[in-house]
Amino acid sequence: MLEKIQVILQYLLPIRWITYLAGLGASWKGGWITRYIILLFIRIYKINLQECIDPNINNYKTFNEFFMRKFNINTRSIDKNPSTLIIPADGIISQIGKINNTHIFQIKNSSYYLDQLLAGHDNIINYFRNGSFVIIYIPPQNCHWVYMPCTGTLRELLYIPGDLFSVHPKIIKNIPDVLSRNEKLICLFDTQFGYMAQILVGSAIVGSIETVWCGTITPPRTGLVKHWHYPKSYNNNITTKSTERNAVILSKAAEMGVFKFGSTVINLFSNDTVLLNEKLQLNNIVKIGMTLAHGKIN
C-alpha cells in the first residue's frame, strides 16, 4: 500500500518546484540551524565522518556543502591492477549484466533499450551494442561524488532534459522507463578498453549535477538538449587529468562529477572488451574502489 502511495505521489506532486525549493533551502546559510540539520542527518543515517576529507561539520556553511563533502579516497582499498575497472560510486547495484543488441534489461512491464537511454544518438548507441552495463543507485546518505572506473579521455558530453522522478528502486520498478525519461548527463569516454559511457541520472530533489571539467550543468533547466565534443588526447602516457590540446583526461579513481542529492550512475561498456565481476549481484552494496570488471586492452 505504501509503495503504491509513493508511486502516485510521483505523478501528483509538483516535483520540479519541490526540487527548486529544496535546492534553495540546501543553499541557505542558516548558521546553527544548518549545523543542527546536518547533525540530525548524520545521526539518522549513521554517516562515518572519518571518510570525509573535512570531518568538522562546523566548516560546512550550507547543507549543500555537506552534501558535496569531499570523500577521502585513501580510506578505501582501490584495485590498482591496470586491467581492472573499479566501482565508480558508493551505492546499491540496481541492475547489472549484458546488453542484448540494444536491449539492456527488463523490469516488470518496462524494457530499457540503448536507443531510449542514449536519446537516439546512433553514433553512441553503436559503441555499446552487445556490450555490458551496471546501474548503481546512490542513497541520500552516501558520498555523492562519482569517480572514474578507469582512465579515460572525454570525447562527448550530452545533457538530455527530462522528468525528475525519484530513482529509488521501488519507483523504477513501478513507473515505466524512469531512467530513460529522467534528465541525464551522458559522458562518453575513450579508454584503453574501448568506449565507456558514464551516465549521471537526475532525480527528484537533485538540485544540481556538476562535472569536474565544466562545473554546473544543471540548473538552469531550459528544456534544451546540449551537446559538447572534445578532442582526442595526444599524450601516450595518460595517468592524470590534463588539458593538453584541450583534451579532458581523467585517471582511474579520479573525481568525475557530483550530485547535490542521491541519484543514479549508469555505466555502459563496449562489446567483448569488459568482463563484469561475476561476484557482483543485484542489490549488492558496493563501495568506490571495489573491482567492477576486468578489461581487455585494445
From Swiss-Prot:
Cellular component per GO, a single term: plasma membrane
Top enzyme category: lyase
Top-level taxon: Bacteria
UniProt-listed Enzyme Commission number(s): 4.1.1.65
Gene Ontology MF terms: phosphatidylserine decarboxylase activity
Reaction equation(s) it catalyzes: a 1,2-diacyl-sn-glycero-3-phospho-L-serine + H(+) = a 1,2-diacyl-sn-glycero-3-phosphoethanolamine + CO2
Membrane topology: Peripheral membrane protein
Keyword rRNA-binding among record annotations: no
Predominant localisation class: membrane
InterPro entries given in the database record: PS_Dcarbxylase (IPR003817), PSD-B (IPR033177), PSD_type1_pro (IPR033178)
Pfam family, one: PS_Dcarbxylase
Protein name: Phosphatidylserine decarboxylase proenzyme
Organism for this UniProt entry: Blochmanniella floridana
Organism ancestry: Bacteria, Pseudomonadati, Pseudomonadota, Gammaproteobacteria, Enterobacterales
